[in-house]
Swiss-Prot record:
The keyword Membrane does not apply. InterPro entries: Ribosomal_uS19, Ribosomal_uS19_bac-type, Ribosomal_uS19_CS, Ribosomal_uS19_SF. PROSITE patterns: RIBOSOMAL_S19. GO terms for biological process: ribosomal small subunit assembly; translation. Belongs to the universal ribosomal protein uS19 family. One of its GO terms (cellular component) is small ribosomal subunit. The gene is rpsS. Gene3D superfamilies: 30s Ribosomal Protein S19, Chain A. Keywords: Ribonucleoprotein, Ribosomal protein, RNA-binding, rRNA-binding. This is Small ribosomal subunit protein uS19. It comes from Maridesulfovibrio salexigens (strain ATCC 14822 / DSM 2638 / NCIMB 8403 / VKM B-1763). Protein S19 forms a complex with S13 that binds strongly to the 16S ribosomal RNA. It holds the Pfam family Ribosomal_S19. NCBIfam families: rpsS_bact (TIGR01050).
Amino acid sequence: MPRSLKKGPFIDDHLLKKVVKAQESGDRKVIQTWSRRSTIIPEMVGLTFAVHNGRKFIPVFVTENMVGHKLGEFSPTRTYYGHAADKKSKAKR
């Protein structure tokens, strides 16, 4: 169920302060954040965020196509190695 339009997009206050500060100073430094739940707003376009995935920080450069999505969507938390293959089928090849 999507968020109510009258509430507006959710963004953590501390992250919003960092975004405003980066926009005012014109600084292109990477903004480190643990806030995966924050929605990407148009003011974030062009900035780079280091989003924590539980183990390390993944750099995410925000583009116009990402507006409306969450920061956590672009920082995967699980590593997929593929399904286990049968040893017999590998031996035949």
